[in-house]
Design a protein with these regions (language model features):
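Structural motif marking the loop-to-transmembrane transition
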Residues: 4-5, 64, 147
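Short glycine/proline- and aromatic-enriched beta-strand/turn motifs that initiate or cap beta-hairpins
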Residues: 24-76, 80-85, 196-211, 215
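Predominantly the C-terminal beta-signal and adjacent terminal strand-loop region
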Residues: 34, 151-215
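Generic short beta-strand segments
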Residues: 50-54, 86-90, 127-128, 170-173
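Gram-negative (and chloroplast) outer-membrane scaffold detector with strong preference
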Residues: 68-149, 157-163, 202-205
Length: 215
């Protein structure tokens, strides 16, 4: 448990440091919207995406992991969101499903505008996970549960009308799970480019009351 706590703490610090809401406005010539600028503060955002990663071993065993996250968030200011999300994923090895997973939890996402139509986004997820995996001792599926910590960058393209396309091109995550038969196991993902890729779409929803001056 001592080593588990150290790992969780280290990954959390790394993720928050990398994706902190205090991202410098000078980075890549980007800027964060000021509090008095017209922005999405107080709006809600809903999103859906499809994530994909592939690993081929020297024995030509192909492992494909796909997931479909869905989430809703709230703009606490013009640049940062907090929210909840859910994702289902499965792992296929040589066309056989060996792993099914559900995960749900909270997320935090800071952003920096890169001009008028592009956004650099970071996201940190903290999730409870549960599902089934193929047992190493017997050819049967067994239940598991645990948690996942994840940090990743995205590039967003503003489409107008509150819509945006988002592309995930890297990921750093830790998954810790346990079963009755095997106890705790730990796995990591640290990929970039085609090894871990995702594409999604989001929509901002504005329920704020508009003053007469806004009309």
């Amino acid at each position: 448990m001592k080593y588990l706590n150290k790992t969780v703490f280290s990954l959390a610090i790394a993720g928050v440091s990398m994706l902190s809401g205090n991202l410098n406005a000078q980075f890549l010539g980007g800027h964060r919207l000021k509090s008095d600028e017209d922005g999405p503060k107080g709006q809600f955002m809903v999103y859906g995406s499809l994530d994909y990663s592939k690993l081929t071993t020297p024995s030509s065993s192909s492992s494909t992991v796909s997931s479909a996250p869905l989430g809703v968030g709230y703009f606490i200011n013009n640049n940062d969101l907090v929210g909840v999300n859910y994702a289902y994923s499965q792992n296929t090895v040589d066309h056989n499903v060996v792993y099914k997973q559900n995960e749900a939890g909270i997320w935090y996402s800071p952003s920096v505008m890169l001009g008028k139509y592009f956004v650099l986004i970071g996201q940190v997820d903290a999730h409870y996970v549960w599902g089934q995996q193929l047992s190493t001792a017997a050819d049967v599926m067994q239940n598991f549960n645990g948690f996942r910590l994840r940090a990743y960058p995205l590039i967003g393209i503003v489409l107008g009308g509150g819509w945006a396309l988002k592309f995930k091109f890297a990921e750093l995550s830790m998954l810790q799970t346990k079963t009755k038969e095997e106890g705790w196991t730990k796995s990591y993902v640290a990929g970039i480019s085609g090894s871990t890729f995702g594409v999604g779409i989001s929509k901002n929803l504005d329920f704020r009351k508009k003053s007469k001056n806004d009309n």
